[in-house]
């Protein structure tokens, strides 16, 4: 098991504490930087803040997105064709912070390596970012990131899945700070009609070894689904459905975010 120093308190901890005090889950929304273009993506992210999203996941578009579903893959491809850069993501984080929101970055690891791990952590913290979600990085290979996250007081959000062995899950949870990202279905992301029944079991496995908050993602697209997941998870993560809504325009994005924000407050009464 990887040895992890936890010298800093979680930056996202107060968000989950506040939500828990209000007997609800946090709404965590993902959008990629640069879709449909950089200014419009920043406007969309600030709209999420204004519409009730507790944490914004700011995506770094990447040319080989192995875990993204078709909706997000199409959006990130369009962003890359438009010339989006990692620095645009940092600017988006700063805009979210100025708007009163709380931002984390979600990125495959290669763009961070190219930027420089410590430099990225430094610049993310300077922009007001609170942490980093790293879907293709495992703690055993994250020594540079573990050190940089301590140096720059950033949360580190690793992924667990139904296929995670008990040993892998325990090591991942120990290395995480802020929350753990529970992938509620196997395979790529994307909105779906039925939320995975594996998700409650996976959250229970995390809760058995830690009190760290757990966010469940991969598939939520409705108020009822958000309410369902809010019964057992600390955070409800929505990505593809928000990207689809943005394709239809900011009013639709605001409306869906409001519906989802109501869902995380409703529980199973939705």
Curated annotation (Swiss-Prot):
Was identified as a high-confidence drug target. Belongs to the TrpA family. GO terms for molecular function: tryptophan synthase activity. The keyword Zinc does not apply. Tetramer of two alpha and two beta chains. PROSITE patterns: TRP_SYNTHASE_ALPHA (PS00167). Signal peptide: none annotated. This is Tryptophan synthase alpha chain. One of its GO terms (biological process) is L-tryptophan biosynthetic process. It catalyses: (1S,2R)-1-C-(indol-3-yl)glycerol 3-phosphate + L-serine = D-glyceraldehyde 3-phosphate + L-tryptophan + H2O. The active site is at 57 (proton acceptor), 68 (proton acceptor). The alpha subunit is responsible for the aldol cleavage of indoleglycerol phosphate to indole and glyceraldehyde 3-phosphate. Its EC number is 4.2.1.20. GO terms for cellular component: cytosol; plasma membrane. The keyword Cell membrane does not apply. Pathway: Amino-acid biosynthesis; L-tryptophan biosynthesis; L-tryptophan from chorismate: step 5/5. PANTHER family: TRYPTOPHAN SYNTHASE ALPHA CHAIN, CHLOROPLASTIC (PTHR43406:SF1), TRYPTOPHAN SYNTHASE, ALPHA CHAIN (PTHR43406). Keywords: Amino-acid biosynthesis, Aromatic amino acid biosynthesis, Lyase, Tryptophan biosynthesis. HAMAP family: Trp_synth_alpha. It comes from Mycobacterium tuberculosis (strain ATCC 25618 / H37Rv).
């Amino acid at each position: 098991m990887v040895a992890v120093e936890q010298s800093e308190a979680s930056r996202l901890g107060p968000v989950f504490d506040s939500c828990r005090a209000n007997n609800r889950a946090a709404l965590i929304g993902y959008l990629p930087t640069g879709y449909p273009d950089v200014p419009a993506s920043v406007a969309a992210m600030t709209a999420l803040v204004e519409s009730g999203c507790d944490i914004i996941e700011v995506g770094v578009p990447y040319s080989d997105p192995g875990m993204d579903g078709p909706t997000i893959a199409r959006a990130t491809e369009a962003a890359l064709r438009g010339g989006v850069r990692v620095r645009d993501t940092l600017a988006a984080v700063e805009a979210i912070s100025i708007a009163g929101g709380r931002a984390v970055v979600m990125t495959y690891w290669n763009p961070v390596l190219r930027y420089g791990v410590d430099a990225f952590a430094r610049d993310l913290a300077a922009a007001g970012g609170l942490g980093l979600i790293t879907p293709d990085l495992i703690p055993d290979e994250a020594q540079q990131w573990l050190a940089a996250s301590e140096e720059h007081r950033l949360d580190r959000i690793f992924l667990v899945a139904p296929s995670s062995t008990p040993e892998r899950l325990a090591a991942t949870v120990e290395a995480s700070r802020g929350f753990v990202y529970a992938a509620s279905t196997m395979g790529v992301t994307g909105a779906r009609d039925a939320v995975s029944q594996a998700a409650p079991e996976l959250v229970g496995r995390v809760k058995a070894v830690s009190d760290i908050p757990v966010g469940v993602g991969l598939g939520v697209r409705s108020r009822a689904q958000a309410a369902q997941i809010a019964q057992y998870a600390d955070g409800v993560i929505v990505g593809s459905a928000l990207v689809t809504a943005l394709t239809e325009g900011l009013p639709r994005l605001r409306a869906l975010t409001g519906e989802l924000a109501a869902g995380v407050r409703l529980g199973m009464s939705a």
